[in-house]
């Protein structure tokens, strides 16, 4: 199995210094997510035409698909200040008050991992999002009073990998709720070629496609693999990345040809072997592999479905013939099934 961090969509420490230089700054330069981009483009243009703050936006989807990049692009397109923070950083009401009290007119305020806000901090955010005011408690005990401070109108952008953990009251305060889906191979190939150009690395089409196929539909992983392949090309080849160099480097890193990790394989093998291909409920799968059902639904399933290994049905999850072939599992007959002429 490959290093889990290598094919994880979560941001790693080493990613930060590279991502800043590789991120597109305009919506037109952002590859993929065409429907989402159209919705954002309309909202941005409408806000500019009216001279107003854009509606609050909630972006959700698996990690590494570009939620933070899109938030910074929105600020760039609106030509306003961009203030980022994250749910875990806002530990106290005072932390949020300090940011909100300094927000300027039409500014973009970005909260990553918004599902991790503490309840009392989240409640304080409600009035800011809906009424553009901050309620501050002054004093203690019976003499304590609440003061409401007006705020300039601004745009809040929340990002989450776990939309199901965002409370309904918070979710309802966002005018736009948009999902990012895993990218297809052609989109990822274009991203790899663009990143290679910015890194001044020569790469052939076949090599870019090889990386694109193995990055789990995730640009962050694609860029991470590109850096590893670049290292291999410089040390073991002539610095140029052709398909053979890419294949050799990725095989050396134990990156599966579809970029599957241990959890992906556990999910599929549980369905294929333990439950004879399904249908089986997501809660049952979650209990079998000691994983949260929301994580399976929001992080792992989208990619497995995109690959054609898994189908969602009203009765549960069902493995496809492609999954049986790829994982080399022989289909087991259920009670009452009859073998075909070729299985008899």
UniProtKB/Swiss-Prot annotation:
Annotated region Large ATPase domain (RuvB-L): the residues are: 1-183
Superkingdom of the source species: Bacteria
Q: What are the binding positions for Mg(2+) in this chain?
A: 68
E.C. code: 3.6.4.-
InterPro entries, A to Z: AAA+_ATPase (IPR003593), AAA_lid_4 (IPR041445), DNA_helicase_Holl-junc_RuvB (IPR004605), P-loop_NTPase (IPR027417), RuvB-like_N (IPR008824), RuvB_C (IPR008823), WH-like_DNA-bd_sf (IPR036388), WH_DNA-bd_sf (IPR036390)
State its location(s): Cytoplasm
Protein residues bound to DNA: 312, 317
Which BP terms does GO give this entry? DNA recombination; DNA repair
> Which Gene Ontology cellular-component terms appear in the entry?
cytoplasm; Holliday junction resolvase complex
Q: Which SUPFAM superfamilies match?
A: P-loop containing nucleoside triphosphate hydrolases (SSF52540), Winged helix' DNA-binding domain (SSF46785)
GO MF terms, alphabetically ordered: ATP binding; ATP hydrolysis activity; four-way junction DNA binding; four-way junction helicase activity
What is stated about domains? Has 3 domains, the large (RuvB-L) and small ATPase (RuvB-S) domains and the C-terminal head (RuvB-H) domain. The head domain binds DNA, while the ATPase domains jointly bind ATP, ADP or are empty depending on the state of the subunit in the translocation cycle. During a single DNA translocation step the structure of each domain remains the same, but their relative positions change.
**Which named protein is this?**
Holliday junction branch migration complex subunit RuvB
Which gene specifies this protein's sequence? Answer: ruvB
